[in-house]
Amino acid sequence: MSRHLFTSESVSEGHPDKIADQISDAVLDAILAKDPKARVACETYVKTGMVLVGGEISTKAWVDVEDLARQTVKDIGYRHSDMGFDGASCAVLNAIGKQSGDINQGVDRANPEEQGAGDQGLMFGYASNETSVLMPAPITYAHRVMQRQSEVRNNGTLDWLRPDAKSQLTFVYENGKPVAIDTVVLSTQHREDITQETLREAVMEEIIKPVLPEQWVSKDTQFHINPTGRFVVGGPMGDCGLTGRKIIVDTYGGMARHGGGAFSGKDPSKVDRSAAYAARYVAKNLVAAGLAERCELQISYAIGVAEPTSISIDTFGTSKHSEEQLIALVRRHFDLRPYGLIKMLDLERPIYKQTAAYGHFGRDNLPWEQTDKAADLQADI
């Protein structure tokens, strides 16, 4: 019997890097709502009392970047100076310019179907049948713990919690399947007057126990709740935040490889984002079709070129079909040119801010999470 441990982490919506991601995607969504063909590469930096929004944007639309940044910070929960950050009073600096014409000439074409990739790069998509959402268990439950922290903070159950938090879960795998949770780490920002005893009991009862499946938790499971003790100073006062610094949290928690490109703040002409979504869509449908228990798909592109420069598939010995058979199947059923995948997933619309916290994958309301191709794939193999 093969037995090993695997660990993934997540962070809350109030983590500094996630504040930056959400502001970048708030700007993107506001622009796409008015101009679906806009070219957006929006980067954000946050630190005590300051938000800096920069990047390259080409659009016919006007949006109030300052108001979008402030509202995003307030929606996350930073509304008072005693939290170290206040959306109403922080400085917002705007350093946005236009997209380079050199890039634009490689993307836009007279025939839209010949739209070139916005950059070179390699992207990965992954799926596994170990959870109902066809995602790895460690990242799935690390996200759910963080979502529960946000829920009890906002609904008043634990109103002394603050927005900044992190989780980390270590799972025991036997023969490639999760069988138990070995370790849970949860650190959450809190109000200054809360004792560690009160915090640890409340976090265990209100956050951890309601989320983790009972069959995976035992007397051997270790829990580390705020293991350093006091966590009052957090958010941008504790650390600066930057768009695109949580790419493993955003994807598969380290279970799959990553091409290196971040997602937030980028319109769908940027294959860093759109092709990673398409790769997840393909991998998930292959697993949903029963053609593999695990599947990792890699796609690569050249700037200005429509067709992918490569497609490869690894099923880790869980498929009865060869890589060549599966790639041929993918080519028949999925158009992975930039124009094709944007059309296939209907990506030129304001759907991105919701992805900027708690992961871009494993959420059934998103187009790249649908398994509508599974039956056709199964019938055609």
Swiss-Prot record:
Broad class of enzyme this protein falls into: transferase
Catalyzed reaction equations: L-methionine + ATP + H2O = S-adenosyl-L-methionine + phosphate + diphosphate
Pfam families: S-AdoMet_synt_C (PF02773), S-AdoMet_synt_M (PF02772), S-AdoMet_synt_N (PF00438)
Entry keywords, A to Z: ATP-binding, Cytoplasm, Magnesium, Metal-binding, Nucleotide-binding, One-carbon metabolism, Potassium, Transferase
Record pathway: Amino-acid biosynthesis; S-adenosyl-L-methionine biosynthesis; S-adenosyl-L-methionine from L-methionine: step 1/1
Binding sites annotated in the UniProt record for Mg(2+): 17
Residue sites binding L-methionine per the record: 56, 99, 239, 270
Intracellular or extracellular location(s): Cytoplasm
Region (Flexible loop): 99-109
Keyword 4Fe-4S among UniProt keywords: no
Entry's cofactor comment: Binds 2 divalent ions per subunit.
InterPro entries for this protein: ADOMET_SYNTHASE_CS, S-AdoMet_synt_C, S-AdoMet_synt_central, S-AdoMet_synt_N, S-AdoMet_synthetase, S-AdoMet_synthetase_sfam
Cellular compartments per GO CC: cytoplasm
Record-level GO BP terms: one-carbon metabolic process; S-adenosylmethionine biosynthetic process
EC number, UniProt record: 2.5.1.6
Annotated residues for binding of K(+): 43
Role of this protein: Catalyzes the formation of S-adenosylmethionine (AdoMet) from methionine and ATP. The overall synthetic reaction is composed of two sequential steps, AdoMet formation and the subsequent tripolyphosphate hydrolysis which occurs prior to release of AdoMet from the enzyme.
Family label: Belongs to the AdoMet synthase family.
Protein's UniProt name: S-adenosylmethionine synthase
Species, as recorded: Idiomarina loihiensis (strain ATCC BAA-735 / DSM 15497 / L2-TR)
Gene coding for it: metK
